[in-house]
């Protein structure tokens, strides 16, 4: 254990702007094992207020009352963990990150009762899918949507502060909530395998992104990679110290469960590796924590001599060390892990060491008083005498090298397929499910194949967001979700047939596998079933579906005619087409939800849905032609007219030229010939490059960017107006995030 005469060192070297020293009495004692002096933000009150705000939002949104002894980030002794992790943070960004951290603690509490990988995923999965991939029907509960609303709020506020660093925070945050149950419940035979998962699960990769964001620092990928030998050690020390301090609480929780459960801790890894009891394992872990910090200091000294870093890198290293020191102090005195510590109270906002933060406190050795010993004593002295049983069983899997951030595309496809394997997964909607026909197998085959392909889940996320306003009864909303999902996939099947598209979502299109006739028949059958489902919801829902279904077909008719005749529409005609086709499904969802709404029934989202549909498609147009991969230029291969292409063709016509039009006519002839040959009808790389060059010269790409930015502003204005119309509580963070993600 550390000596009271330890030679403490300041973090850095660096200049301090927003932090002050922590009172020395909190760390100059035998309980604090680190060499680094902790500092705390002068704006600790900002962090505390953000955390209380997150608690209130959680209770109001979920209807769940937090337990009286439930503790997150706030600590009236050592200070708020975010003020200790990020003492040099910009106040506005400290507020954002503190809210996010409190959300993580509340989410972590929800996973505490999980005793199987499946139960873990039930709680953990929806947050990850909201930030990334296609959702599941079980994701859309009030509790999950409440957590997603809080995530969306943090994401929007971070992106508005700094889009680049905000995106980095969101990306790394997704890594935390993407850890799967099989990873959380696996047996680890070595500390390396354990740490490999914990660097995701415990948020190590998220912490460094938050440091950059909070302190407004930009490092290149090369600079971050060069620092990995240091950052890996620093974050390993933080994770192991967490395991050391949290062991009593987590072990006690585990022992209370008759059925066992997850108890991911380095203490238990050491117990299994070396056959130690919990006391010896904890002492061994503490020695490892000290050794790792020593190794960090040695490596840092060598790094500073061999590769003298630029000032901004030196500053970043200092921020990491402050994070290490703050993490060490906070765990010692937090009620979350120490039952002798006081509970946070709202009247204690901004307090440190039980009183207001004193910026004049100097680092002077002070011995602990007897009253402090219940809080600042080595955790090993508070261990219970109860022994533990192993936490794994034969059903748990061993560690694999696949990590959440490194999941292969094949693995993603398998997971997507696994969630859409059966008729029941895709079609059954209680209580409005239609009876299974005795001979449905053939007619559903093409549809089930299409629905099993990975998708973005954009429409499900949109309905989650709209339900913030409409509060549709769960059964009705589940039916509407199924209708929209089926209508979307069925329309894609028909589009691929009519456009002769060989690929959909990275796999062969359904008609390539099942033939045109079977695919068309399957899609038509499913659309009929959707009409039946809408009828069961009521006349208003049926009317919504039929009117928007008509618009979808009208929009497709224009697209087919333009492509067949190789005649570009006017830009207003193209916009009208987008509102019919892409906006049609969005409006169908919003109108059906409004028809079944229990609140805000007066709120008409049609204009917003039309704008979102247009924005969604124009961004897709732009990204397809500006992609670095030539193989992505699908619109050119299919002969589809997009805004950049339409703009360039009209400019060419004004100038009396025909080159671009001639290329498109030749491409159309090649596609027609490919229908009776082995040629896939795709444009050559050289032709695609030429078209891209012509679009740039015509100013069509810049024109598209300008249009998208203007449309983005218009969409946000309409969204704000709807929020005002919805009245108190009408702020829709999820819709703001959906809109922001369409920005270019």
Curated annotation (Swiss-Prot):
Its cofactor is Mg(2+). Keywords: Isoprene biosynthesis, Lyase, Magnesium, Metal-binding, Multifunctional enzyme, Repeat, Transferase. Mg(2+) 1 binds at residues 108, 112. The keyword rRNA-binding does not apply. Substrate binds at residues 108, 112, 198-201, 246-250, 336-337. Mg(2+) 2 binds at residues 108, 112. Mg(2+) 4 binds at residues 495, 499. The DDXXD motifs are important for the catalytic activity, presumably through binding to Mg(2+). This is Dolasta-1(15),8-diene synthase. It comes from Colletotrichum gloeosporioides. The gene is CgDS.
